[in-house]
Curated annotation (Swiss-Prot):
Coiled coil: none annotated. Transmembrane segments: none annotated. InterPro entries: Ig-like_fold, PapD-like_sf, Periplasmic_pilus_chap, Pili_assmbl_chap_C_dom_sf, Pili_assmbl_chaperone_bac, Pili_assmbl_chaperone_C, Pili_assmbl_chaperone_CS, Pili_assmbl_chaperone_N. The keyword Signal applies. Residues 1-21 form the signal peptide. Involved in the biogenesis of the F1C fimbriae. This is Chaperone protein FocC. GO terms for biological process: cell wall organization; chaperone-mediated protein folding. It is found in: Periplasm. Keywords: Chaperone, Fimbrium biogenesis, Immunoglobulin domain, Periplasm, Signal. One of its GO terms (cellular component) is outer membrane-bounded periplasmic space. Belongs to the periplasmic pilus chaperone family.
Length: 227
């Protein structure tokens, strides 16, 4: 592999959901079914003039590096207009919860190659980290994932709206509205709850929302009732 020296006075890191400039990931989330030996994630450099050093790693739900999943190759160089495949391998040894999904994060850092014309100069270097969900999904969960969005429950608590998720799946909730009031997007863990603020002036009315499915697409709008 070609070795790059990144020589700059400043190296700045940014976290973004999926892609930066010419470097893009092939999905917005990765589902890892229990029992599968590995899953794959495509990485593409769409920029024909730029090369990147790609570094990848897995973090747990708290944002700490986690060895329960192995990602390979962890480091490689990528020329313009090329595609590579990251392999994610289960190293959990059967030690994951069997009644719900578990959340991890896939991180892919793209470091642009140094411009040889600027060798010895001080300039700003941007390294971008794309970060997407990795959801480990056990077999035999009580309901299929397609039914989970309609199971959300809503209650008013301390001036906010509490979302309770009784399902075994992580639910990413978007386009959430209370009456005509738009609320913040959120992610509700399995068997867990999250509270979001309700803007002043809400006097009741239907709750409507969408969720994001396994393919990164929005589901149809769902109506909920505040209990």
């Amino acid at each position: 592999m070609r070795i790059w020296a990144v020589l700059a006075s400043f190296l700045v890191f940014f976290y973004i959901p999926q892609s930066y400039a010419g470097v893009a990931l092939g999905a917005t989330r990765v589902i890892y079914p229990e029992g599968q030996k590995q899953v794959q994630l495509a990485v593409t450099n769409n920029d024909d003039k730029s090369s990147y050093l790609i570094q990848s790693w897995i973090e747990n739900a708290e944002g700490k590096k986690d060895a329960r999943f192995v990602i390979t190759p962890p480091l490689f160089s990528m020329q313009g207009k090329k595609e590579n495949t990251l392999r994610i391998i289960d190293a959990t040894n059967g030690q994951m919860p069997e009644d719900r999904e578990s959340l991890f994060w896939v991180n892919v850092k793209a470091i642009p190659a140094m411009d040889k014309a600027k060798t010895g100069e001080n300039y700003l270097q941007f390294a971008i980290v794309s970060r997407i969900k990795l959801l480990y999904r056990p077999q035999g969960l009580v309901i299929p994932p397609e039914q989970a969005p309609g199971k959300l429950e809503f209650t008013r608590e301390n001036g906010g709206l509490t979302l309770f998720n009784p399902t075994p799946y992580y639910l990413t909730v978007t386009d959430l509205k209370a009456g005509n009031k738009s609320l913040e997007n959120t992610m509700v863990p399995p068997q867990g709850k999250v509270t979001v603020n309700i803007p002043g002036g809400y006097t009741g009315g239907d709750i409507t929302y969408k969720t994001i499915n396994d393919y990164g697409a929005l589901t149809e709008q769902v109506k909920g009732v505040v209990k």
